[in-house]
């Protein structure tokens, strides 16, 4: 019987939970104090890198979003250190944060469709 998930998918799911908890509870930087959602985690096959896609509650200003992503990338070594303590992995992947704007795009499309149905 074929496995439903491979190891990198299971690790990506666990990383998503742990990183969301770390960002919410352990990061004390006041410049990042907003609601951050970890929407997706992609782990490389050799588990050396993890791309973390995050979205922000107040993501209207593009400059603020870029600044917050930069701050998260600077804090990635600290987050990785906390992950080493919380996960029992031989190799904890290097973390790279990216902005996920799919929610904003989806919201924009639904507003356009709603306006079309009203006409």
UniProtKB/Swiss-Prot annotation:
GO biological-process terms attached to the record: maturation of SSU-rRNA
HAMAP family: RbfA
Domain of life assignment: Bacteria
SS bond list: none
PROSITE patterns found in the cross-reference section: RBFA
UniProt keywords, alphabetically: Cytoplasm, Ribosome biogenesis
UniProt subcellular location: Cytoplasm
Any GO MF annotation of the entry: ribosomal small subunit binding
InterPro entries, A to Z: KH_dom-like_a/b, RbfA, RbfA_dom_sf, Ribosome-bd_factorA_CS
Task performed by this protein: One of several proteins that assist in the late maturation steps of the functional core of the 30S ribosomal subunit. Associates with free 30S ribosomal subunits (but not with 30S subunits that are part of 70S ribosomes or polysomes). Required for efficient processing of 16S rRNA. May interact with the 5'-terminal helix region of 16S rRNA.
Subunit structure and binding partners: Monomer. Binds 30S ribosomal subunits, but not 50S ribosomal subunits or 70S ribosomes.
One Pfam family here: RBFA
Family under the similarity heading: Belongs to the RbfA family.
UniProt entry tagged with the keyword Disulfide bond: no
Originating species: Buchnera aphidicola subsp. Acyrthosiphon pisum (strain Tuc7)
Listed name of the protein: Ribosome-binding factor A
GO cellular component, one term: cytosol
